[in-house]
Amino acid sequence: MGNILTCCVCPRASPGLHQHQGLVCHCESEIYEAAAGDLIAGVPVAAAVEPGEVTFVAGEGLHMHHICEREMPEDIPLEPNPSDHPKASTIFLRKSQTDVQEKKKKQLCKVSTEHFTQQYSSCSTIFLDDSIASQPHLTMTLKSCDLGTILSYQAKRDAHRSLGIFDEQLHPLTVRKEVLEEYFKYDPEHKLIFRFVRTLFKAMRLTAEFAIVSLIYIERLVSYADIDICPTNWKRIVLGAILLASKVWSDMAVWNEDYCKLFKNITVEEMNELERQFLKLINYNNSITNSVYSRFYFDLRTLAHNNGLYSPVYLLDRERAWKLEAFSRMEQDKVFYSAAKNGSLSADDLIHLQRAKAILF
């Protein structure tokens, strides 16, 4: 494997005959195009060709495609995908910039008192919130992810780029037989999406980082499958993303039966099919790097700030300072013990780890 061997028959009786026997592989190279042109003339007579020497020559001018290039789907865009590359701008932040600029233009003629009520840190006072990349604030993260779903993709009422597996009209989640048609005609409100997601997170006891992972999977689905989020499919798309995120990134066992208990009109087989199709549409790419996760976290903070959503801030006092020092000490101890097992720790690190001090006021 790795080389292409071509069989060349050299007849002695008729050296001008350029006929080939056997099967010819369909390739875009000139060699196989010429061979295909010779086959049009017809099949050579067996008596005209005498037994000759058979030589095997390795094709040097043939272009060998890697196996990953052959399996790469053609419908994936060539531009960097934000769910795969941390340097690419996220879709929800890029599409929400237009709304932010329009809001700023409207606020130019108005005197807003919002910035007067905000608290800022100074040399003597420091205000901190409870949201960090490893442990984001649950409520603010859910609201930001909901904004990233409803504002970024601009849910379309007449979206034709959708799939039947996500259509709620074909696969309803509730037991209500009579669903108003107006429910599927108008874009979902922010409160409706937030209530739906918060119910899932409370029932399954998920933390805030699962919301960020779910949003990454949603962007990956929209980019890979080239579909739109519309009023008829947003619930099943969000459900599939949360289901996949909880299964991949949770340390505990998660069963589809647990999600079926939240919806009375869905069976385990339907939930399995939803998960299977979601994985297939994202090409089974469920891995997320730390840089991509951090990019989504900070872009969500920017999106929340642009829409007037702020995490509750607290004054840094002695008790909170000691807690921060304890958390940092725990991280340092993790680094210390992991480095001690590997035998890669310098003397300077031992000196710094003996007594860690915090600047208090």
From Swiss-Prot:
GO terms for molecular function: protein kinase binding. CDD domains: CYCLIN_CCNY_like. Residues 204-286 form the Cyclin N-terminal domain. SMART domains: CYCLIN (SM00385). GO terms for cellular component: plasma membrane. Keywords: Cyclin. InterPro entries: Cyclin-like_dom, Cyclin-like_sf, Cyclin_PHO80-like, Cyclin_Y. GO terms for biological process: regulation of canonical Wnt signaling pathway. Belongs to the cyclin family. Cyclin Y subfamily. PANTHER family: CYCLIN Y, ISOFORM A. This is Cyclin-Y-like protein 2. It comes from Homo sapiens (Human).
